[in-house]
Amino acid sequence: MPTPLTLADFDYHLPPELIAQSPAAERGGSRLLHLDAASRLHDRRFPDLAGLLRPHDLLVFNDTRVIKARLTGQKATGGKVEVLVERITAPDRALAHVRASKSPGPGMRLRLAEAFEAEVLGREGELFDLRFPAPVLDLLDAHGATPLPPYITHAADATDERRYQTVYAREPGAVAAPTAGLHFDQPMLEQLAAQGVQRAFVTLHVGAGTFQPVRVQNLAEHIMHAEWYTVPEATVAAIARARAHGGRIVAVGTTSVRALESAAAQAQDGPLAAAQGDTRLFITPGYRYRIVDALLTNFHLPQSTLLMLVSALAGVAPIRRAYAHAVAERYRFFSYGDAMFIETPAP
């Protein structure tokens, strides 16, 4: 019996200077590390992806839109407070992370952005239930800031508002971008369509939990964060058409993987059907993928659930080798970094 994998199996050394602090000059200007079906590595540029895709392949994009979820302000006592909206639960209500010297209690009012007050209604685990005086999305659009990942050290600016968002984003609700999609510009999408590559969409609202480290050595003890997703009927039909024509299902990003495989899990042994709801799907090596044949993704944090997910698709050893190669070749890592195209290992 093989030794169970532990957190240490997903660690690697990353020089801090390889963490990309800003996007490439152009969306398609990144490098692309290609891990092919024979587990061979190829150094490419992102536009080379077009030559790796075939007619009838189906690209599945996550169309979530990053909201300006970060707010700063004061408690009634004058103490500073920072709010990160995690999930909008009603037009005027949201669950949020609240950072303050002392946690606010029910009934406390928070003065935010020097513009309005939000009332603390209660708490759900680590999140605070807040009531806003107007639609949450409207207030965030007017007064919020783009919530950049914790490893990006500068404050969000106008460039981040534009570039930390995919060109096809349309469903507001994410507090982190589905970063594999950041590499696509409109000309690239049009080129792929012209060569017969199909596209479909899912929605998964990426939460701040995507950046949380795994804190247990025994992976079976990890409690996965919940994220809301939907796989529409049109995407289910597109998957069936691609399969019928011999095309591959290529997930653009790990969030698309989670949505597709969550829908498959909901269908159990039946055919894939439209699905939506919260998912806590935790994909680790040994998981049997039911929908995804290939994956476009960025490079992920050491010891993260997303590194485990890609290792489940390609194998632990090939991913470890790919990451060592990426570090040696000075690829740029994480949200604003370079991309990786992973094809399912040949049987």
UniProtKB/Swiss-Prot annotation:
Signal peptide: none annotated. Its main location: cytoplasm. It catalyses: 7-aminomethyl-7-carbaguanosine(34) in tRNA + S-adenosyl-L-methionine = epoxyqueuosine(34) in tRNA + adenine + L-methionine + 2 H(+). The keyword Transferase applies. Keywords: Cytoplasm, Queuosine biosynthesis, S-adenosyl-L-methionine, Transferase. Its EC number is 2.4.99.17. GO terms for biological process: queuosine biosynthetic process; tRNA wobble guanine modification. It is found in: Cytoplasm. The keyword Cell division does not apply. GO terms for molecular function: S-adenosylmethionine:tRNA ribosyltransferase-isomerase activity. It comes from the Bacteria. It holds the Pfam family Queuosine_synth. Pathway: tRNA modification; tRNA-queuosine biosynthesis. GO terms for cellular component: cytoplasm. NCBIfam families: PRK00147.1, queA. Transfers and isomerizes the ribose moiety from AdoMet to the 7-aminomethyl group of 7-deazaguanine (preQ1-tRNA) to give epoxyqueuosine (oQ-tRNA). Monomer. Belongs to the QueA family. This is S-adenosylmethionine:tRNA ribosyltransferase-isomerase.
